[in-house]
Amino acid sequence: MVFGIIWGAKNTLPEFAEQIKLLLGFGPVRQGERVLINGIPYRVEMMGVYSYLKNPLLTGGTLRLPLKDLVGMRSRPYDEKEPWFPCKEGDYVLIDGLSTWRQVKLQTPEETVFNWFEMEESMPTSSFMGRKIFNISATPFWAGINFSIAYKHRFEALGDLRDKLSKFVEEEIKKQPYGEHILYPWVDLAGFGDDSSLTFMVWVQAAPEAAHKYGAMSLDLTHIALNAANKYGWEIIRFKPVAVHHPEQAKVLLENSSTAVG
C-alpha cells in the first residue's frame, strides 16, 4: 500500500508542479497571451483551477478548461493586428479556390456553418482553419473567365480586338446591380490554346460590398463576352472558368500549360 502511494505520488507530483507554475505565472501558458487549441487561437482571459479562454469572433467562443488541460500547451504574446479568425459571421469567403463561394452563417469552436443559396452546409471549425480561406468581404477581390476565340483573329488580337472587348466589358459590367462597386476591369491576351485559339482573360476587380454577388459575376462576364463576340463577329472557341485569385495567376497558368503541351 505504501509502495502504491509512493508510486502514485511519483507520477502525479510533476504534473502538479506544472500546474502550480501555471497558477503563479511561471509556466508556458500565461494570462493575456494567445494559445492555439485544435488550430484555433484563443486569448487566455483568466488562469485558475478553471481557466477561461476566449475567441471574440466565435459564437460560444469562451472555453472553461481545468488547469490540468493547459499542461503541455504553450502561449505567446500577440499583436493587436493579428486576426482571431479568417472571417466573421455574415462574411463571404472563397474556400480552396474560386469555385467554392460561401457565406458564413455561424462559427463556433466546434462547427462552422455556411449558407449557399439558402442551403446549409457545415464543417468542423478545426478543419476550416486548415483550409485556404480568402475573405472577399474584407478586401477587394477578382472574378473572371477565360474567353477563347479563333486563331484567325490573331492580327487584331493585341490592338483593335482587345480594345473593343475591354471597352465593352467596362461599359456592360457597370450596368449590373453591383456595377457601382466595380473597381477595375482587366482584359488581356493570356496565351494560345491547344486548338489554335487565342485565350483572353476577362476579369474585374470589385469592392468588398459586392461580395454577395460573386456567384453571379463569372456568369455575367460570360454573357458580356458572348454579346461582344456577336456584336463584332468574333468566332468563339470556348469559355472556361478559372480557379485562381488574380488575373496574373491565370496568365502564368496558361503560359505553363502552353509550355507543357509544346
Task: Please name every model-derived segment.
Residues M1-I5, N11-V29, I37-Y42, G48-V49, ...:
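Structured, soluble regulatory/oligomerization domains located on the cytosolic or IMS-facing side
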Residues G32:
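Conserved hydrophobic/aromatic pocket- or pore-lining residues that grip, position, or stack substrates
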